[in-house]
Amino acid sequence: MRPDSTIARKIETVRGAKKNKTRLTVFVTVNSDGSDKRRAWLINKSKTPVAFRKAKINPDNWPIVYKSNKKAWMLSGIWYEFLGKLNEDMKAQGRHIALVTDNAPTHHPPEKPPIEYTGPKPSVLDHITLFYLPPNTTAWLQPLDAGIIRYLNAGYRRRYVTHIGHQQKFRLHHMRQP
């Protein structure tokens, strides 16, 4: 059973547990044949999570780019930072690419930032051409949603459930009988 479901009937109330509202945003970038995979970007609520501090983990040494904000959402500033770094990489490699993206509110082109955007001026994209998918078609037209992202979510949930199972097994094993 998944961690967000229960065997209680709808009219019954389940006491002692709340639904976990922990959120992460992960975004991945890959070319059409999968030969060029970029580092995934992970957005979390905490700038330095307790688990990182306890384990003395430096996210800069990870194979991902770690960012944080209050709601763990993709924001225009993070989007522009991502585009700037990708543009620099393409410039260094002497490549020009087409980047297909959805039309999320944070995915404004750098030359037209949203009115409420107050961050640094976005980079000029001279090695990236942005192509936006039409509204409400992401699930059908974006191959990452159907394959890679689905697999990533399934793997994350599997590891999460396994981790919770190990914790519960440990707790039950050490309980004393009355």
List each model region and its residues.
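RecA-like helicase/translocase P-loop NTPase motor core
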Residues: 1-178
